[in-house]
Amino acid sequence: MRTPHLPEAIATRKYFDREFDRQAIKLLPNEYYVTGEDVVLTTVLGSCVAACIRDEKAGVGGMNHFMLPDDEGGTADRMLSASMRYGCYALEVLINELLKMGARRERLEAKVFGGGAVLANMTTLNIGDRNADFVLRYLKTEEIRVAAQDLRGPHARRVSYFPVTGLALVRRLTRQDDQVSVERDERALARAIATSGTAPSRGGELFTRASASRTPS
């Protein structure tokens, strides 16, 4: 079986966020960002998941945004060799970049979000559940403490993460237009992964300022 190419891109979309009165970085699918600056990292998640990981003592933190490849019709070996390797890579890139900036593995804490049922009808196994299960299992295996989580459920989410303080704000996107937009983009992402064995290094624009319910983590 062909080994999938596993690109992971540093997020480059920066803007000034008036709501939080600071510099912000938008993460698209298959992107990550690590920093020690007082900025906000934002992303929108449907079935995808984001891991927000920091070392409080080192003062560095980061976020990623990824989706496991669809293994519908595949064997268990294929799932381990493709999907699991893909997810491990996405998290290892984030963790390794944190370590390069002075973080210590034993001090890392994580907050994880996403895994919604946005693409529930795409396979017999909900992609969101699989993404959520994977990220929790990975962090447990790596002995990284999960300080907070908001996973699964029917809605897409907008996550705002402040890596210096560790604060994470989650808005559930309940408007039908937002749900449809996220579902459309994530279906395209899932098809791209299934077709090529990888995700594009730049995903579609998923971000919205629409009103939505909001909960801190």
From Swiss-Prot:
Annotated region described as Disordered, given as residue ranges: 194-217
Keywords: Chemotaxis, Hydrolase
A UniProt-annotated Pfam family: CheD
InterPro entries, alphabetized: CheD-like_sf, Chemorcpt_Glu_NH3ase_CheD, Cytotoxic_necrot_fac-like_cat
An annotated Gene Ontology molecular function: protein-glutamine glutaminase activity
Reaction equation(s) it catalyzes: L-glutaminyl-[protein] + H2O = L-glutamyl-[protein] + NH4(+)
Domain of life: Bacteria
Gene Ontology BP term (one): chemotaxis
EC numbers for this chain: 3.5.1.44
UniProt xrefs under CDD domains: CheD
NCBIfam families in the record: PRK13487.1, PRK13489.1
Function: Probably deamidates glutamine residues to glutamate on methyl-accepting chemotaxis receptors (MCPs), playing an important role in chemotaxis.
Family: Belongs to the CheD family.
Protein's UniProt name: Probable chemoreceptor glutamine deamidase CheD
Organism: Cupriavidus pinatubonensis (strain JMP 134 / LMG 1197)
